[in-house]
Amino acid sequence: PICANPHADSLALSAMRLIGPNLRAAYREPRNAAAREAMMLGATQAGLAFSNSSVALVHGMSRPIGAHFHVAHGLSNAMLLPAVMRFSVGAAPSRYADCARAYGLSGDSDEALAQALVGAIEQLCADLAVPTPRAYGIDKARWDELAPLMAEQALASGSPGNNPRVPDAAEIVEGVLGRAGSIDQALHQALDAGWSL
C-alpha cells in the first residue's frame, strides 16, 4: 500500500490483537467492562493507524453508499469489507497474513493465513448481524443503477489508490459491488447473499 508505514502498521496490528478477541463479547455483553475497555483502546489505535497512513478502497466505497443510500459510514464499511478483502487479498498476502496472526489465526503459509482472515471477517460480520445491502433495505435495481457512479465517486476520493490492489471503475463495479458474473460466487455471497445476480 502506498501510505503504509511501520508506525501505522504497529498500531493497526495492536488494534487487531485487541479487537479480534473482544468485539463479539462487547457486542453480545454490553456490560462486559473488560471487552469494552479493550475495544476502546483498539478503536483508538485503529484510528491512529489510519490517521497516519490514510484509508483505502473500503472507505472510498463507503462514502458514496452513505450518500446515496443513507447508510452510516461504519456500517457500510462492514457491509463491504469481506468483498473488498476478497478483491484485494491476492495483492498483499503477507500483509493479510500479518493481520491474521494479530487476529489470532494460524496457518501453514501466508496465502493460507490471508484466506483464513477473509473467512474469519466474513464470519465476524455474520456473527454481528451486519446486514447485506438488501437486508438493509437497499433496492437491488437502484444499487445496480448507481454502481458506476459510486465507483467513479470512490475513485475521485483518492482512497482506492491506497489499496493493495488498485482498482479501476469497472473492477469496483464488478469485483466489489458484485454486478458482473465474472467474479466468483463466494464474493457475491459475501457482498449480499440475498441477491440473485
Where are the regions a protein language model picked out?
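Alpha-helix C-capping/helix-to-loop hinge sites
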Residues: 1-2, 26, 46, 68, ...
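Carboxylate- and glycine-rich phosphate/diphosphate-binding segment that chelates Mg2+/Mn2+
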Residues: 1-53
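Intrinsically disordered or highly flexible coil/loop and linker segments, enriched in small
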Residues: 4, 28, 32, 49-55, ...
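Alpha-helix N-cap/helix-start motif at coil-to-helix transitions, marked by capping-box chemistry
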Residues: 6-17, 55, 75, 90-93, ...
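Predominant activation on well-ordered alpha-helical scaffold segments within soluble catalytic domains
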Residues: 13-24, 40-44, 58, 62, ...
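Glycine-rich phosphate/pyrophosphate-binding beta-alpha loops
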Residues: 44-77, 157-161
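Active-site pocket-lining segment
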Residues: 71-135
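C-terminal charged capping/lid subdomain of soluble metabolic enzymes
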Residues: 106-197
